[in-house]
Regions:
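Bacterial N-terminal signal peptides that target proteins for export
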Residues: 12-25
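Bacterial N-terminal signal peptides
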Residues: 24-33
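Intrinsic-disorder-associated, low-complexity terminal segments enriched in Asp/Asn/His/Tyr and depleted
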Residues: 2-5, 17
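Asp-box/BNR beta-propeller blade signature and adjacent active/binding-site loops
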Residues: 36-392
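Gram-negative host-targeted secretion-system effectors, predominantly Type III and Type IV
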Residues: 1, 32-35
Length: 392
């Protein structure tokens, strides 16, 4: 064979070998693509737990024969064991009642003396701890509708001022949340449907508002709109910060019942907010109250109002992570804390986390058939939920 012919033949074989390699690589690539498209990353399903019958966890905070007791909020003092609770003698409207626990919610005092004006409260009271720029600590208590009024205490709740208006504006569930901003200010969140913001008594669109305090909660600015929605009725916003402190989220009730609950985020200390979007069914309900557990998870107490939920109207809790909120995931656990015998009337805050990691969550509900609602606390630890989930 001629040498030149041999070189041509060798080159021809090389071309064939290269084509085989290319074809093989192409087949492998196609197989990889098909394999990826046919498989999804494993996502653990939401686990439903039920503590309703675990009566050893339950403590009656207050109950009165024939009397509606509702809508409590709580605050944990710095000693890690004193919890204060306020709640109305009636459905939102009614005299503000006040109790104290000095042992982390295991036992509660008798009803404590309150200022005369607290008997005139028109709406659900809320209580918060604040600190002014000088470092002095205060307790502030709000009572809503028109006008929003406030009382404060300078001695850890031993004595209180009368209720006085904070401005010429009103609102509903004032204040649903209080956020300590990085500059030392406080941002209070409430909502209105047009009736009380200017006392016009004319229902219109729902708006979530904020008011700011520069002096530790003693005085407040005029309200500004945080978010609204063209179709949904957003209200009762529960605030929580990201673990790194850079982002604030508001978890909101949707009052028209046409949507799931909503969430919005701010990365500039509440100056601007993302477009509100729906949350998963597992977080759909009313009056979300969130606290971080000692292991970094989120515990959110709320009234279950998810469509077709077997626990609709009951007191439930959601356990998950901040990332679950951001990514719209279902979370780790959904826990029925107590069966409400009414279709919907139950479950406002609060949620406190003790130094040993115990969660003390307190709310009202129709806990007995044909009886008005009363106030109950439940104590639990996230590790106990983990153990319960493993036994399923």
């Amino acid at each position: 064979v001629d040498k030149s012919d041999s070189n041509v033949f060798t080159q021809f074989l090389r071309i064939i070998d290269m084509r085989k390699i290319c074809y093989s690589l192409l087949i492998l690539l196609l197989m990889a693509i098909v394999g990826c498209s046919g498989s999804k990353p494993h996502v653990k399903p939401l686990i439903n737990l039920d503590l309703d019958q675990d009566v050893a966890r339950q403590v009656v905070v207050d109950k009165e024969q024939g009397q509606y007791l509702g809508h409590p909020t709580t605050v944990l003092l710095e000693d890690g064991k004193t919890i204060l609770v306020v709640y109305p003698k009636g459905h939102g409207r009614g005299a503000i009642l006040y109790k104290r626990s000095t042992d982390g919610g295991r036992t509660w005092s008798q009803r404590l003396p309150t200022p005369k004006s607290w008997e005139t409260s028109l709406e659900t009271p809320t209580i918060f701890r604040t600190q002014d720029p000088s470092g002095k600590k205060h307790l502030v208590l709000f009572s809503g509708l028109y006008p929003i009024r406030m009382a404060h205490s300078e001695d850890d709740g031993q004595t209180w001022t009368e209720l006085e208006k904070i401005g010429d504006f009103g609102g509903i569930v004032a204040m649903s949340s209080l956020v300590h901003l990085k500059n030392g200010d406080y941002m209070a969140i409430f909502h209105d449907d047009g009736r009380f913001i200017r006392n016009e008594n004319k229902a219109s669109k729902f708006y979530v508002y904020k008011a700011l305090s520069h002096d530790g909660g003693l005085t407040w600015t005029a309200p500004e709109v945080v978010v609204t929605h063209d179709s949904a009725q957003l209200c009762e916003a529960g605030a929580v910060r990201s673990p790194d402190g850079r982002t604030i989220a508001l978890l909101m009730r949707e009052n028209s019942r046409k949507f799931n609950s909503f969430i919005t985020f701010s990365t500039d200390e509440g100056q601007t907010w993302s477009t509100p979007r729906e949350m998963p069914t597992s977080l759909t309900g009313d009056r979300h109250t969130a606290q971080y557990t000692r292991d970094g998870r989120l515990f959110v107490s709320f009234r279950d109002m998810a469509k077709d939920s077997p626990t609709k109207g009951d007191w439930v809790a959601w356990v998950g992570t901040w990332r679950d909120l951001v990514e719209g995931k279902e979370g780790q656990y959904r826990v029925r804390l107590k069966d409400n015998k009414n279709q919907w009337d139950s479950t406002y805050p609060g949620v406190e986390v003790l130094p040993d990691g115990t969660i003390v969550t307190t709310t009202y509900g129709h806990w007995a058939e044909n009886e008005p609602p009363y106030i109950v606390s439940i104590r639990l630890k996230p590790t106990e939920l983990d153990a319960l989930a493993r036994r399923r």
